[in-house]
Amino acid sequence: LGNRTGIDLPGEKRGYLVDSAAHENRHKRLKWKWARGLILNLSIGQGELVTPLQVASMVGGVGNGRELRRPHLLKEILDPRTGKVVGLPESTLVRKLPFQADHIAAIQQALDSVVNGTQGTAHACRLPGIRVGGKTGSAENPHGDKTHALFAGIAPMESPEIAIGVVMENAGHGGSIAAPIAAKIFRRYFELTGRLKPDTTRKEIHVP
């Protein structure tokens, strides 16, 4: 977080991950000093700015055991005359998350519990035969009467191959708004890869 992912698009933003020096420089005119209470706020995401792609990249790194890889929009390069594949984007390792293996395992277990645990907030993201893990979020919104709804998830938990970040502005709670959207994306991915049968029933998600 706080760094560009390196995706092959111009204009990507870094987001904002605050530390004491950055905080005091940003609020120099108001003389708002760094305080311990700000650390508690940061632990729940208060005062930070992230892009949906950073959210997906982060949860993907947790899922695959600490590796952050550069995302690409490009799937393959085709020869226009023959239609044959002549190139593929490289899977470049950007960095490794600086966490111990047991810490990563604890986070993975927590992600699993959010979707599959009895008190989890993302039951809407469950899929038959596919174990999904994730985290919901409902971020305070100073520009509307509803929170921003967030969900970050990976699947399948035993060997993750897809990571998703969903952000719905001024939409409500992450568990009731963002998680069902993520479930549709997960389902479609596993339908396309042959792990799930196509869902013939159409369900609509209404965002107030």
Which role fits each region the language model picked out?
Residues 84-92, 181-208:
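Short, gly/Ser/Thr-rich active-site loops of penicillin-recognizing serine hydrolases
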Residues 55, 174-186:
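Short, charged, low-complexity patches
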Residues 1-167, 174, 205-208:
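Beta-lactam-recognizing serine transpeptidase/beta-lactamase-like catalytic domain environment
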